[in-house]
């Protein structure tokens, strides 16, 4: 493989969704003690067994790194000890609304990644975004701060450990903009969207474990979400042409087979087996600059409405994510005026309601009125 060390790569032009360093997504590259800055597109692409260490990915037009490889064959990726800052200078979400194509690092169909000891800050959009059939991630000992959007999104993916990260002052820009527009969705700092633990898919864990993190003065906390209308073969599946890791042939996810197990369960990405414990959630609204629209934790789904043949219509998915998919907060510390959203999104709960029936969340957790401590 190629090693790039102690080199500055700057002011190159890559097209949208392409990158400058390792443009052809070759395997086995090592990038260390490098500065990759002020390029258009992504600063880096990625291949299998790539190591990105002690480098600065700064002020690139779209991503710091786009961890996507044609054929979805990235395995064993390491991103360690880097500064990842100021990326998406070309503001692609404004140029292509809803593209989901920006951030510090975007991971796509990566099987096995260690993301540790990075400083991910002041990116325009999401800090770290794992989207579409990623699996077996360890995201540990990072400082994620002051990103315009979520610090971390784990979406339509599987099996991750998110541990011992410091996550502060994220999502102020996007959270405030949504609130100003009257959008009440609890846009999260750690956003788990149609992603969960799956024992049938080999990994170092069979859950999504969120433990030992400090979340301080972010717009919101952790949101566990499912879009009831997003599943294989549905128009609401934005990962066009993809199905879950459990179903190889997307065409099987259709009537009548999808209405019964195993396809009823396996044709959708499920937020399940998420274990949130031993975290500190600190909120001072005077620091964040918000009132009632911030400081929320959430586990919920929308009502299923489409397509016509969907077996997930009505409140089935909301009931499942809230009560039957082993999503559990426990043993956490809260300081500040936190509130909670559960079920179908229409209910905002205080800590007593959240801990009481029927939700029974945050057993063994402590709640206090002030941030800090």
What do the PLM-derived regions correspond to, one by one?
Residues 1-373:
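Extracellular parallel beta-helix/beta-solenoid repeat domains
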